[in-house]
Amino acid sequence: MPSVTTITRFCSYDSVNGNGSNPFYRERGTLVHELCADYDFTGELPTGTGVDGFLKAYADFKRDYRPKWDYIEYMIGNADIGFAGTLDRVGYIDGQLAILDIKTASKPNLVALTAQLTGYAWLLDKPVILYGLQLQKKGDYKLIPIQADYELFKACQVLHKKGLKK
């Protein structure tokens, strides 16, 4: 069963450089995700990680919004709709059920983020608010509200399925 990020990969393609995401940034993002999850579980903010600014930004977001997470790095799939995904966070922000996706890019790709969060909302199958959380290297963050766009996600599904036919 394909993942949401596999289905939406077309939105992340860099037409200028002819590739997807840079491996360095992908690895950095993975590390930040792991350390933010550790912080959620332990309440301890690690230091000396090489990504301390991103972690400070996440801690500041948590201080400012006081989210109540029901799920952290939540793996979900649905055979009936034919895809799966790992949702960074699901829980309550400002009293509303939300899906939050963490981004570490200096300029998040909003089309890709919209497609990704829409896929996650479809999987969760509950009324939710969608957010991207941009964590910045210097310790700032930006909470980005996203409107679900099912036409965009379905277009990604069509491209994905066409790519499977050879």
Each predicted region: which residue ranges?
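Metal-dependent nuclease catalytic cores that hydrolyze phosphodiester bonds in DNA/RNA
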Residues: 1-84
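Nucleic-acid nuclease catalytic cores
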Residues: 74-166
